[in-house]
Amino acid sequence: MIQTEYANIVKKIAIENGKEIFLEPKKLKAFLSDHTKNEYKEENAFLLSVLNTDCIKYIDKAENLAECRQFLLKRLNDEYGLVSAKSSEMLDMLFLVLRGKKVESLDESRKNIARFQMCISIGYNAEGSHVVGLKAVGKVVAVGSNDSGQCNTQQWRNIVAVSAGPRFTAGLKLDGSLIIAGGTGSVQINAKDITAVSLGNSHIVALRTDGLVEAIGGNNYGQCDTQRWRDIVAISAGIFHTVGLRGDGTVVATGYNDYGQCETRQWRDIVDISAGFCHTVGIKANGTVIAAGDKAKWHCQIQHWEDIVAVSAGMVHTVALKADGTVVVSGSNDFGQCNVQGWRDYIAVRAGLFNTVGLKADGTVVVCGDNKFGQCNTQSWRDIGLTVD
């Protein structure tokens, strides 16, 4: 992190009459020249050197700050020979002081994105598909197949997260309890200390505040055998398997494993997970993605992905969100579910059977792919995932 004291010293010049303004490079150069301190000699020298290059014009015009930072680090090294152990931190401060914008680290981006990932979900099977969205006021909207009442969420209130299964939808309430719509019969979890929920084909998985996992419902493949799991911080239910992320970055999995989708024992430094049908994917701390399972179809391109902050494994494709708000995808595109090339400013993504769902920063939702059941008809949705005063 940038040294707080030094950052405050540099920012003092940006305060006039109690109101914060953003500096021009010339004014910042004068300030740095007049405020040299021995303990900040290295920082001042580096910043002054950067301000004397043409790199400032890129900071001034940059739309994607994270990409601009990487570009400038390389340019400063290759073209100007400017290298410092704190180069990245100093550039971050230039963005903050000159543009008034903070460049988030991958870890910060992932933490911010995580709550938005819980605001959209897609349930699917061979006979139907539906999309669910959580509105800012705690209400839930749903569109698509409703043969079992899975879209009957109109009366829900105080919801903080949603998850969709093939014929049912789950909402996590503010008090830590669950509410279910659709054809689950007597399948219910009555605990009130739940922090996350994920739905499989016929099973419900819930993460408790104590790091334990409850899983009930169909267990023909052992997908509910989570009783021995401990220190779990994230969960994901696939069609017939369940995956859990431990606090130490390792991953546990149980259930259907004919394609090797549960072979995650060797995974390390994982920060997020997603279970699909024949594969499981995880994000590593460095922003790359790892996969287990049927790699022939769904893993072929992900080894080149970088700066990933969210990932979702579908039935026959995988979709991921980059730190810059763009979306990458790999796998089958038979129904156009991979047509995300022009997507920008997204804050959450989900993969379904033949669909990809994306939540934009403005609170709208876009769905591409098959629309046989009307699951793409989200054009009227507003304020999904946003905070409203």
Each PLM stretch: what is its role?
Residues M1-R110:
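Charged, amphipathic alpha-helical regulatory modules used
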Residues N125-H130, L134, G144-Q155, G182-K192, ...:
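Short glycine/serine- and acidic-residue-enriched loop/turn motifs that recur at repeat junctions
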Residues Q150, F168, K173, R208, ...:
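Intrinsically disordered, low-complexity repeat regions of secreted/extracellular protein precursors
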Residues I159-V160, I194-T195, I232, I270, ...:
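Repeated scaffold domains used in trafficking and secretory/extracellular systems
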